[in-house]
A protein has these predicted regions:
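Acidic, metal/ion-coordinating pockets
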Residues: 1-401
Length: 401
């Protein structure tokens, strides 16, 4: 059988960017290289590129919620065997329309296929097709958000279809769980002292100081706008079904740092399965969530991160955001015959750049309490994904869904 592997969110936050920089040069390869032991047996690898490649003149990442990575990031992705990426996510427009265009140009130059975002004059194939063995695949990707509230980049006129939107550009798509009255009172007091509203980064730091971080949840389902945006999904699916044996949906949607999928993402996944997709692989929550078979189709509500900086102040450690999934589709005779997954961890050691390490490889290097803690975390992630208690003695390279 052939093996298709799907990864989650590939990000470069400010801490990671600083770690891989040396005298103005950047080297991401050592950070991603350990993943090769998971990916070397894969025949095709897909990931979510959650950063523009807008060039140095646009300013590399220095803010937590506005990304731009050096082109050499793509060299590292090629090095570990990534064949295709989705560019449709909430950071697609962090450097505006021009950054979107340059991103796909850089990917073309390095030979990585892409889908989800397009220049305004694009007249090619919006669906990504690829063939592995005797099976032809179609990959359709989209995003529920492009951070309009932060970057204020709109998509109108000829640019209305430059991003595969699953929710209107101007909408949020997630709401925060209610905060305790004590925080609201403190926030009002601090803003009164400063004479202005706190920006997102400041209010997030205040939550952390008060030890009350909160996950977000996408429980709002605005049916009218959903149906309007869903129309392109239906059209692309119909086209893909005519031309491919296996059609995969790769949406960017969910509540950040929430270990449970929200109603919006659950509804969208259900609609995708009803439409006929052969598998759904979502991301954006920055933590792993459950997976299940719906009508016999594998559905992962969040694959988690590939390269989120451990310890980022706005993350919620309790949800284990430093662990991510690599989902493997074993295919033969034009069908998905089996689904497995691997677990890896983003490891940060003092004085060296973050590394992304498969948990079985990492386990072999640890001793004592560190070994026990890793095993406990892997067990928690496994149970969260499968709904089953673990039955293995040590962390494994792959697990059956």
């Amino acid at each position: 059988m052939k093996k298709i592997t799907i990864l989650g969110d590939i990000m470069v936050e400010p801490p990671f960017m600083q770690q891989v920089e040396n005298n103005g040069e950047y080297d991401f390869k050592p950070s991603f290289a350990p993943l090769k032991t998971i990916l070397e047996e894969s025949d095709y690898v897909i990931g979510n590129l959650e950063t523009p490649l807008a060039g140095p003149e646009s300013g590399y990442t220095h803010e937590l919620v506005s990304f731009n990575s050096p082109d050499v990031l793509v060299e590292a992705l090629v090095d570990i065997g990534i064949d295709a990426v989705s560019t449709a996510n909430n950071h697609s427009l962090d450097r505006g329309y021009e950054g979107l265009v340059r991103t796909v140009e850089v990917l073309d130059r390095y030979g990585i296929a892409h889908t989800g975002t397009y220049p305004e004059d694009f007249d090619g194939e919006r669906i990504h097709y690829f063939t592995v063995g005797d099976t032809k695949f179609a990959l359709i990707a989209g995003t529920f958000n492009t951070n309009f509230g932060i970057n204020r980049v709109d998509l109108v006129g000829k640019r209305a279809r430059c991003v595969n939107m699953l929710h209107p550009v101007h909408s949020g798509g997630a709401i925060y769980l209610p905060l305790p009255p004590a925080f609201a009172k403190t926030l009002a007091y601090v803003e009164g002292l400063m004479g202005r509203k706190l920006v997102w980064e400041e209010s997030t730091k205040l939550k952390r100081v008060m030890d009350m971080p909160r996950c977000s949840i996408d429980d709002i389902i605005p049916m009218e706008s959903f149906e309007r945006c869903w129309q392109w999904v239906c059209e692309d699916y119909a086209e893909a079904r005519k031309n491919a044996d296996v059609v995969l949906f790769y949406p960017h949607s969910g509540g950040q740092f929430n270990i449970e999928p929200g109603k919006y993402t659950q509804y969208m996944v259900k609609r995708a399965v009803e439409l006929g997709f052969d598998g759904v692989f979502a991301g954006h929550a920055h933590t792993t969530q459950r997976a299940e078979y719906l009508e016999g189709k594998p559905c992962f509500y969040s694959l988690g991160n590939v390269s989120m900086s451990p310890g980022t102040f706005y993350s919620i450690p309790e949800c284990l955001p430093e662990y991510g999934l690599a989902v493997h589709l074993h295919t033969e005779k034009q069908k998905i015959q089996k689904v497995t997954f691997s677990i890896f961890k983003m490891v940060q050691e003092e004085g060296v750049p973050m590394k992304v390490v498969p948990v079985d490889d990492l386990y072999a290097t640890l001793e004592g309490e560190e070994k026990q803690l890793l095993q406990a975390h892997v067990s928690e992630v496994y149970t969260r994904v499968t709904g089953k208690p673990h039955t293995w003695e040590n962390p494994q390279k792959e697990y059956d869904l």
